[in-house]
């Protein structure tokens, strides 16, 4: 009998795999790598200005009230798509501090001229230093930072119109 | 018109697959020794089906060659400006085309089996053809219902959107077709195993029928993996030849199962042992091919080599996988208990060594399977993990090292039972080589453990592989034995290449001004200049690197950084300088703001041996097939002559004396 | 629909100039450390870190700009005296186990280590059953045969 049972083992293993694979096919493939820094304080950083129009950004700039930290770049196409949403958030009184990844001043100025400027400050991160330090894996990404400088929420990818209320609620929660 | 012919041929072939399946199944209804009248259609159905499926593939090939932009598949994967060779190879550089290739090879091998295999009992043959028809039917359904390669566009496209530049390489001409043919060859092994299981005809005669198919599939898989590894090595631009990527593992797993199957079939053929185990491996090997296809096509795992993925098609393949493999394992569980145990043997014997090798190969297979699928398992719980070389290398080495040691000794052992004392000299020689080489290499420097062990094992294995020839007249050694010797020697060669690459590679990354020189090992590499060049569908910058070994005459290498414009993508075309003892691998990168150019150069000693070894292994397999087939043909001729003589004697009348057999 | 069209149009217009950044790579993205011992440490570590923007490649095998920036982090941290284990820990604290190709025993990876042990046990069991017992029986059978 022991031998008979052994003969069913391949089928059992296969059934387990088929079930798992079938389940995974129904799931949306999650290409995002979430930051593990949620709930942690922002690391110390001080970035120079990304172009002449606005000051650079540092950790100290997040003190006072909850703010958005927007990781973006002038060479990134989805960043164009989210520009109107950032404008809308700014119109609601949200302060947005930008970090421009691997960017040149002229390109930053050009981008802001074409698609609007929702930022209060933009730091230039030429070697993705701060991006890596906060666990962001692409552009654009948007983080909610509370008044104590703690990372509270991460939004991966461009902000759609439907994402705006969620971000406002997270900012509210971070009060 | 061609597309419609192709589509019609596919539908007809599918209909014939139904006929083959039903007719083959009727063979099972026949009483032993008799032939069911309805069973006679299975063979012709398989043969005609092979012609139709190959015709369908030829039609698609033609459409790609002429860039028929009214076909959706051509428009979305080809481009009129592509060189002809890449137009042709582009036929299988996409999902639909590669599945049609798969089905074409499947039907072709089914046709060959039906047309030429006359040794099996009709009942077993019928069952085998029924299973083969059933498998083929599933894939026809998949092609016709979920991935029709002949779909027309309502309005022909003005221009095609091109082929992924990474695939625009001669590697695409070799790697997928060989690998697919190997995968599909295993489908015949699967059908034969199921046929034998259903009719309980698991015996040496069956094993002799199975063996050439397993060997053939295994040779093709070996070549396919070798070619794929070399292709990734020079195309991806960083000098890596194996990444333990899911898609690579998907091709390795059937190879591991087929290797085990091939050895276990030998035991069954020679000694009538390991019956259940052989059937089990026959099912497992094809399961791994289908699993590979599923992983590659469904995109459930992230891979650097995944070029055409689609979850819905993944679901279809998973359904087929469940049907065939789930069904096969169910029949296995129900029937295998009824297959009589084979002959017995001692632990120290050729069979014993082969069982050890089989179990170790299966364990390596289990590790690779686990490491490949584990990220999928954790993703079900929303946790993402990565499993890579630091896991696969040591975990598989745990089983590979004992396996390689036994592999050195196994061919020297006698069948059934042997005494270790008889092999004292050989055992001492092998041990001395392993220890001696490791000690010698460690004397010259600090090297990682696994490459070090690899060097010792490679040396011992290379010598041990030749030992079966000792004391024999080389002219009398059977061809199949030569095959084994060469294949085992090939493993040693490949292992040597891997170990050397792992232990002694040198890397130089630098920013160089034109005219500047970098030193790597014995080589001085001078950047003579960088010029723009243009190809049929790309532009590139090309570096002129003058390479001098120990101050000798310069050799010019011209690596390129290419920009393809349809689809827009850039690739690094590495330049290789091949010496007998290694390769210099050079890549040109970007230009820095100060005008210097990024160049990357590697010196990889004996890296080429990895692929030479693979080719030797495949050659060994080919010789083995040739040897077995020629013996079979001779035996069949002798039997035929005997029959003829007996018939003649019968005709002469009862007065003639009865010849002694 | 119009938004989609606009997005496509924007994409087409913007593609040539905006598809990729044109910044030069970070200093240590494509340059080795002077000290061969430190470079070997960095290189070994880089081969076991996953490029987050790529498909299943290590940062040592990728031309993606982010992989370059990660290489720069690794090399400059090694140069600053950090150990490879510290750097790996720093990255795992930011990206989770996903960033490391070298699974460590944790609550999400323990089966990767338990199963091979199980396989070893099964292998030993199978070999003992198939070969161990046969020896005794085989000897007996050998005499009668």
Segment roles from a protein language model:
Chain A
Residues 1-48, 175:
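N-terminal targeting signals for export/organelle localization
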Residues 27-28, 48-55, 122-125:
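Short gly/ser/thr-rich secondary-structure transition/capping motifs
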Residues 70-75:
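Aromatic-flanked redox-active Cys/Sec active sites in thiol-based oxidoreductases
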């Amino acid at each position: 009998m022991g031998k008979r049972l052994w003969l069913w083992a391949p089928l059992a293993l296969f059934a387990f795999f088929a079930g798992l694979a079938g389940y995974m096919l129904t799931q949306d493939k999650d290409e995002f790598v979430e930051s593990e820094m949620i709930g942690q304080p922002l690391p110390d950083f001080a970035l120079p200005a990304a172009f002449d129009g606005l000051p650079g950004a540092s950790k100290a700039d997040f003190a006072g009230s909850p703010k958005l930290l927007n990781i973006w770049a002038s060479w990134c196409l989805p960043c164009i798509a989210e520009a109107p949403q950032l404008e809308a958030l700014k119109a609601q009184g949200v302060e947005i501090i930008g970090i421009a990844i691997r960017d040149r001043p002229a390109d930053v100025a050009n981008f802001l001229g074409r698609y609007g400027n929702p930022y209060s400050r933009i730091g230039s991160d030429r070697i993705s230093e701060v991006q890596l330090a906060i666990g962001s894996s692409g552009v654009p990404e948007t983080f909610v930072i509370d008044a104590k400088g703690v990372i509270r929420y991460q939004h991966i990818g461009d902000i759609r119109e439907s994402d705006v209320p969620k971000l406002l609620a997270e900012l509210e929660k971070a009060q | 018109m061609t597309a419609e012919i192709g589509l019609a041929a596919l539908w007809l072939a599918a209909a014939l697959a139904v006929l083959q399946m039903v007719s083959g199944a009727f063979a099972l209804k026949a009483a032993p020794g008799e032939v069911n009248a309805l069973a006679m259609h299975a063979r012709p159905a398989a043969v005609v089906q092979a012609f139709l499926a190959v015709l369908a593939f030829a039609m698609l090939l033609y459409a790609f060659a002429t860039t028929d932009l009214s076909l959706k598949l051509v428009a979305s994967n080809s481009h009129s400006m592509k060189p002809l060779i890449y137009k042709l190879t582009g036929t299988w550089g996409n999902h639909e085309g590669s599945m049609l290739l798969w089905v074409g090879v499947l039907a072709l091998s089914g046709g060959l089996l039906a047309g030429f295999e006359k040794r099996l009992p009709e009942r077993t043959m019928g069952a085998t053809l029924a299973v083969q028809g059933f498998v083929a039917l599933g894939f026809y359904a998949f092609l016709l219902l979920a991935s029709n390669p002949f779909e027309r566009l309502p309005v022909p496209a003005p221009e095609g959107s091109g082929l992924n530049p990474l695939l625009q390489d001669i590697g695409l001409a070799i790697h997928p077709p060989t690998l697919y043919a190997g995968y599909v060859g295993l489908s015949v092994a699967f059908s034969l195993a199921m046929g034998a299981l259903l009719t309980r005809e698991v015996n040496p005669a069956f094993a002799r029928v199975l063996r050439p198919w397993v060997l053939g599939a295994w040779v093709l898989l070996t070549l396919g993996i070798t070619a794929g590894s070399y292709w990734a090595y020079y195309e991806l631009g960083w000098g890596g030849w194996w990444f333990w990527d899911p898609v690579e593992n998907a091709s390795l797993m059937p190879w591991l199962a087929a290797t085990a199957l091939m050895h276990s079939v030998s035991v069954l053929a020679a000694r009538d042992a390991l019956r259940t185990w052989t059937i089990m491996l026959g099912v497992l090997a094809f399961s791994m091919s289908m699993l590979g296809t599923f992983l590659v096509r469904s995109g459930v795992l992230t891979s650097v080599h995944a070029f055409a993925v689609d979850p819905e098609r993944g679901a279809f393949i998973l359904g087929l996988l469940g049907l065939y493999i789930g069904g096969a394992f169910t029949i296995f569980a129900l029937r295998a208990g009824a297959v009589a145990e084979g002959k017995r043997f001692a632990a120290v014997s050729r069979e014993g060594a082969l069982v050890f090798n089989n179990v170790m190969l299966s364990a390596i297979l289990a590790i690779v399977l686990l490491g490949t699928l584990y990220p999928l398992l954790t993703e079900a719980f929303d946790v993402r993990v990565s499993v890579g070389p630091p896991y696969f290398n040591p975990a598989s080495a745990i089983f590979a090292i004992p396996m390689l040691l036994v592999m050195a000794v196994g061919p020297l052992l006698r069948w059934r039972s042997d005494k270790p004392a008889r092999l004292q000299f050989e055992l001492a020689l092998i041990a001395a080589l392993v220890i001696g080489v490791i000690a010698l290499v460690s004397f010259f420097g600090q090297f990682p453990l696994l490459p070090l062990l690899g060097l010792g094992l490679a040396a011992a294995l290379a010598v041990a592989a030749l030992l079966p020839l000792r004391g024999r007249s080389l002219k009398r050694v059977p061809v199949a034995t030569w095959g084994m010797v060469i294949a085992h020697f090939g493993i040693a060669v490949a292992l040597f290449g891997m170990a050397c690459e792992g232990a002694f590679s040198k890397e130089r990354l630098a920013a160089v001004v034109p005219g500047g020189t970098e030193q790597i090992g014995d080589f001085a590499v001078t950047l003579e200049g960088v010029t723009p060049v243009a190809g049929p569908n790309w532009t590139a910058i090309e570096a002129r690197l003058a390479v001098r070994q120990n101050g000798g005459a310069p050799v010019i290498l011209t690596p390129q950084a290419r920009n393809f414009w349809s689809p827009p993508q850039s690739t690094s075309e590495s330049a290789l300088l091949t010496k007998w003892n290694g390769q210099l691998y050079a890549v040109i990168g970007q230009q820095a703001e100060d005008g210097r150019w990024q160049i990357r150069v590697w010196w990889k000693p004996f890296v080429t041996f990895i692929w030479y070894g693979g080719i030797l292994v495949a050659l060994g397999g080919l010789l083995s097939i040739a040897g077995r087939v020629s013996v079979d043909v001779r035996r069949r001729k002798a039997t035929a002559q005997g029959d003829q003589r007996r018939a003649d004697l019968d005709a002469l009348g009862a007065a003639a004396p009865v010849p002694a057999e | 629909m119009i938004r989609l069209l606009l997005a496509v149009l924007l994409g087409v217009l913007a593609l040539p100039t905006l598809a990729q950044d044109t910044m030069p790579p970070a200093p240590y993205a494509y340059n080795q450390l002077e000290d061969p011992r430190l470079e070997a440490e960095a290189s070994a570590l880089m081969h076991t870190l996953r490029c987050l923007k790529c498909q299943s490649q290590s940062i040592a095998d990728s031309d993606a700009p982010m992989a370059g920036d990660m290489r720069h982090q690794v090399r400059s941290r090694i140069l600053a005296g950090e150990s490879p284990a510290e750097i790996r820990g720093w990255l795992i604290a930011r990206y989770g186990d996903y960033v490391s190709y070298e699974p460590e025993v944790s609550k999400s990876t323990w089966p990767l280590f338990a199963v091979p042990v199980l396989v070893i046990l099964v292998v030993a069991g199978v070999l003992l059953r198939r070969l161990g017992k046969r020896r005794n029986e085989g000897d007996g059978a050998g005499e009668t045969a």
